[in-house]
């Protein structure tokens, strides 16, 4: 086993339609904003975030690199950029890399902008807006994904609080689960804004739907880390019917992430909500 293989972290993409909550999800996972407030991720090439203090740069289509300024990211030429690389010191990036993709159906952006980054991905956190969940355009893109990637991916029904009645929530959740059966490792309804606003209030955190999601996410990253220790090939590149390397080692999680996982698991075990209890 090479040093490169030992050190490779899982690479998890944040994907979905425009305004489905990807930026809010990124802020939630990172514990803060990765981009300046005036910068809109939907207007950028994919943004690959890793742990560290390296200055930001962009990777050109021919593999070259050029430094970029965080305050001027929107001036980076999207059509000529494969990916923007950002580095931060935060807990989640000690466990994995995050790649924030632009919206999949932006009429002002060619799908080539995000499709060329798919070979770098091990798993996806897919955000679908609760009021128009799992549109045909989303299903069409997801049909491109190989089983190896799907087996570790999570579907988030975002802005779940916008569904007013319990009946509507159950109807949407059941429909999405039926239409995506076998295509994701797990599906969670969630209000990302409520989760962000919860702070250290674990009751509000759990009520937002974030508790069960985070518990599953950390477990999923643990499994992906063991797979990444055996192969430098991201799971998007593993064809259907091809065996995924067996896990070989455990993940050492930062204590803060472990505490968050334990607290989320305790709250999830105590819930009486039949929809969330079924997750």
Q: What do these predicted ranges mean?
A:
Residues 1-97:
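Conserved G1/Walker A P-loop phosphate-binding module
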Residues 161-226:
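Canonical P-loop GTPase G-domain recognition
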């Amino acid at each position: 086993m090479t040093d490169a293989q030992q050190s490779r972290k899982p690479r998890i993409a944040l994907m979905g339609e425009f305004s489905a909550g990807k930026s809010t999800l990124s802020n939630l996972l990172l514990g803060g904003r990765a981009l300046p407030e005036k910068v809109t991720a939907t207007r950028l090439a994919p943004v690959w975030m890793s742990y560290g203090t390296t200055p930001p740069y962009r990777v050109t289509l021919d593999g070259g690199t050029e430094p970029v300024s965080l305050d001027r990211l929107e001036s980076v030429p999207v059509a000529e950029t494969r990916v923007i690389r950002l580095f931060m010191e935060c807990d989640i990036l000690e466990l994995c890399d995050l790649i924030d993709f632009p919206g999949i159906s932006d009429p002002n952006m060619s799908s080539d902008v995000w499709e060329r980054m798919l070979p770098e991905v091990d798993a996806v956190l897919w955000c679908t807006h609760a009021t128009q969940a799992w549109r045909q355009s989303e299903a069409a893109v997801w049909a491109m994904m190989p089983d190896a990637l799907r087996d570790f991916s999570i579907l988030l029904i975002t802005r779940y609080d916008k569904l007013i009645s319990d009946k509507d929530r159950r109807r949407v959740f059941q429909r999405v689960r039926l239409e995506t059966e076998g295509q994701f490792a797990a599906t969670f309804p969630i209000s990302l804004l409520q989760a962000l606003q919860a702070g250290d209030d674990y009751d509000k955190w759990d009520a937002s739907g974030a508790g069960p999601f985070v518990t599953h996410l950390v477990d999923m990253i643990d499994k992906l880390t063991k797979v990444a220790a055996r192969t430098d090939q991201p799971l998007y590149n593993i064809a259907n019917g091809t065996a995924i390397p067996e896990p070989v080692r455990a993940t050492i999680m930062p204590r803060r992430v472990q505490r968050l996982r334990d607290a989320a698991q305790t709250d999830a075990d105590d819930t009486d909500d039949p929809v969330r209890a079924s997750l």
